[in-house]
Regions:
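Sec-dependent signal peptide recognition
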Residues: 2-10
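C-terminal motif of bacterial Sec signal peptides marking the signal peptidase cleavage site
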Residues: 15-18
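Generic N-terminal leader/processing signal
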Residues: 4, 24-28
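Bacterial signal peptide processing site
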Residues: 20-22
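A compositional/structural signature for long, glycine/proline-rich flexible linkers
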Residues: 27-385
Length: 385
């Protein structure tokens, strides 16, 4: 009988303890979700900003910029820019081609897709989002932490709940949906309309109070370092994978928001050195045959799209392929040249993007690669007219 009473007593204690733990967990969850609002669709990021959209900042003194915190600060700047377009309230659709020049909210945007962005709170080390089953074009979701790392890149349709490394103190994720332009603007916009707010936890992000003028100055300084040589991105997936802080700072300055290369799924990016817009060049390389598509886009020295609307990009959905399965891209070689990009006499750097990059291309395009025909940077030559 005594044993039975002891067991009953123990059961009561365990039950009370379990209830207390559940109440604490509920209280903690409620505290963690303080300030959260119901996620909504911002139909036009531009209209939202024009109506007075702005970012909300943390209290406290202005934070000085150091080599150690630069990536966090540059990331905060991008969160800030997209908050002004509604991304803290749900999913915000940029219904136009990426803006040219410094009007762009993010460096090195491209004209391969339309962008939709959301800032979402990390809950219990996870975030959730959806790629609907009935999307009309290439659709991906990239998940970026507060240090600029693309922790996840998803192309699979469906509802996703993914692990998110918060060991560096990250509390929110920056989600980028890309809707491909392979079927034109109208279809890409219709694809944006299919995207949902499923899984988003919106409304409570505040921007760290960095000295953003100093951030911009540091960014310009870093970009100036690499104008004379090709640049290859590594995009480590979290802070623990950063082995060279300066390299990572360069990557954030030149191409914040890029994805970590995963063969046959995510993307690879490479930047050329600066070239004179008064000369003619071409590069002929093996067809990269990316799973989705590849593209080449030109930028100015600050890595923004040229203001001139007539400066276009070239994309594998439309480029001409040579009979030997090579691709020739021409720069300022005249309208009759194959796949010609005219920079209107302006000096430029070009970026190659491989969406769904192959393992072979990854091996051929990195800082340790020897000259090879899968690397457009190595094949660039001046053309005598």
């Amino acid at each position: 009988m005594k044993s039975l009473m002891k067991l009953l007593g123990l059961a009561v204690v365990l039950s009370v303890t379990a209830c207390s733990q559940q109440q604490e967990e509920k209280k903690e969850a409620k505290t963690n979700l303080a300030g959260v609002v119901e996620s909504k669709v911002i139909s036009s990021a531009i209209a939202y900003q024009q109506a007075g959209g702005k970012a909300e900042f943390m209290d406290g003194e202005v934070i000085k910029i150091t080599d150690q915190n630069y990536a966090h600060a540059e990331t905060a700047k991008n969160y800030r820019n997209w908050m002004a377009k509604g991304a803290n309230e749900g999913i915000s659709h940029l219904r136009i081609l990426a803006p040219r020049g410094k009007k762009a909210p993010t460096v090195q945007m491209n004209h391969d897709c339309l962008y939709s962005v959301a800032i979402t709170k990390v809950v219990a080390g996870k975030i959730s989002f959806e790629i609907p089953q009935d999307v009309l074009v290439y659709t991906s979701v990239q998940v970026i932490d507060q240090y600029g790392h693309g922790q996840q890149y998803i192309v699979t349709k469906g509802k996703h709940t993914v692990d998110f490394d918060i060991s560096d103190g990250t509390t929110h994720a920056f989600l980028i949906w890309r809707s491909g332009l392979e079927k034109g603007m109208n279809v890409a916009k219709a694809n944006q309309d299919k995207l949902t707010t499923w899984g988003l936890v919106s409304g409570d992000f505040k921007v760290p109070n960095y000295d953003f003028e100093a951030v911009d100055a540091k960014t310009a300084e870093l970009r100036s370092e690499v104008t004379g040589k090709a640049f290859y991105y590594t995009f480590p997936r979290n802070e623990k994978e950063v082995t060279d802080r300066h390299q990572w700072n360069l990557e954030c300055a030149l191409g914040w928001g890029g994805a970590s290369p995963i063969a046959n799924e995510a993307n690879l990016y490479t930047n050329s050195k600066m070239y004179s817009g008064e000369k003619s060049y071409s590069t002929t390389f093996m067809n990269p045959e990316s799973v989705y598509f590849s593209s080449i886009t030109v930028y100015n020295a600050q890595r923004y799209l040229f203001e001139d609307e007539e400066v276009k990009n070239v994309n594998s959905n439309t480029w001409l392929v040579n009979s030997d399965n090579t691709v020739t891209i021409s720069f300022n070689c005249g309208p009759d040249a194959k796949n010609n990009i005219d920079t209107k006499g302006q000096d430029y750097t070009f970026t190659v993007r491989y969406y769904g990059v192959t393992e072979q291309v990854i091996r051929a395009n990195n800082k340790d690669a020897v000259p090879n025909r899968l690397n457009p940077m190595f094949m660039m030559t001046e053309v005598t007219q």
